[in-house]
Amino acid sequence: MNIRYLARNNILTLKPYQSARKCTHSGNIWLNANEFPIAPDYQFRYKKIHRYPTCQPQEVINNYAYYAGVRSDQILVSRGADESIELLMKVFCNPGKDVIIFCPPTYGMYKTTAEILGINYRIIPKKENWQLDLASIKSQLNNVKLIYICNPNNPTGNIIHLNSLKKLLKIIQNRALLVTDEAYIDFCPDASLVRWLPMYPHLVILRTLSKAFALAGLRCGFTLANPEIIKLLEKVIAPYPLSTPVIDIAEQALTPISIQYTQNRIATVNTNRNILITGLKKCSCVQQVFNSHANYVLVKFNPKYQVFKTLLHQGIVLRDQSNQPGLVNCLRITVGTYNECKHVVSVLKKLHVASLSI
């Protein structure tokens, strides 16, 4: 029996999302997944793992609501922000009929999730300055239900102009939802749209504990939206989205003292990012270093140096972004520890075109 005949056609042709961990399995310095380089120290407290956990842990929700400056009924907690991306499509998009929009270069899971669910998508590239092409979006809103905007944008690191986002919210009012993916917003909180939630009922914000909170392995994210949207999402979320250990660690991570530790981590990352950018600009193999408001830096390299391959041979793992529109010869470098940033710069400064033979 050929099992493939039983599979959905869109799955047979699906190109799965290539996570940073899938792409590379070996290395000593991991600067490819935008993780915090040092693990926080939390201990598992709950012993009664013979019971199912609650679907929406109230202490986690209440503490994150306080941190984010919203009400508890405006929050859904999920298995990372990736699950939120999927839940929104399940609730608002009819397969084969409705459409989502995303604007590359950007995070790849918007496209992959739509393809898995059989949701049509419309690609509207950003302008050369990586800002939104509002005119093109406005002219292509037919059947659109969701517009996904990553801010700060991954992998470019830039902030989408708030004025553009406000204009977009007005353009799509009574037509679609704007979903702003704020996975990296903790590194530039002034750019958050969270204060706009009371004014725009069609605004949805995605958050995570993976980046600034240094808990990528936990898989815990949040959807911030008006209560009506949250109630709809609760209809389709799994009955036990978070395991008891995840709930336990998330509760600990959102206490006042832990949030202060997170703020200290953010300050360290921002300092190291500036050190990394300054050093990269002095490397002859670098053609351009793009400004960043997140925990990573996008860099365009001279292709003659084969930087990705050369550094990988030395145990330094970066993320190749060359397959994204407008990002030929670009690599994304996660901001690591001070020593990691200095080491990467030191290695890059020593590169010569002769390194092609490596």
Swiss-Prot record:
Catalytic activity, EC: 2.6.1.9
Cofactor: pyridoxal 5'-phosphate
Positions of post-translational N6-(pyridoxal phosphate)lysine modification: K211
Top-level taxonomic group: Bacteria
Pfam families: Aminotran_1_2
Keywords tagged on the record: Amino-acid biosynthesis, Aminotransferase, Histidine biosynthesis, Pyridoxal phosphate, Transferase
Catalytic activity: L-histidinol phosphate + 2-oxoglutarate = 3-(imidazol-4-yl)-2-oxopropyl phosphate + L-glutamate
Alphabetical list of InterPro entries matching this protein: Aminotrans_II_pyridoxalP_BS (IPR001917), Aminotransferase_I/II_large (IPR004839), HisP_aminotrans (IPR005861), PyrdxlP-dep_Trfase (IPR015424), PyrdxlP-dep_Trfase_major (IPR015421), PyrdxlP-dep_Trfase_small (IPR015422)
Metabolic or biological pathway, per its Swiss-Prot or TrEMBL entry: Amino-acid biosynthesis; L-histidine biosynthesis; L-histidine from 5-phospho-alpha-D-ribose 1-diphosphate: step 7/9
GO molecular function: histidinol-phosphate transaminase activity; pyridoxal phosphate binding
BP-aspect Gene Ontology terms: L-histidine biosynthetic process
SUPFAM superfamilies named in the record: PLP-dependent transferases
Enzyme class: transferase
Subunit structure: Homodimer.
Assigned protein family: Belongs to the class-II pyridoxal-phosphate-dependent aminotransferase family. Histidinol-phosphate aminotransferase subfamily.
HAMAP family referenced in this protein's UniProt entry, alphabetically: HisC_aminotrans_2 (MF_01023)
Protein name listed in UniProt: Histidinol-phosphate aminotransferase
Organism listed in the record: Blochmanniella pennsylvanica (strain BPEN)
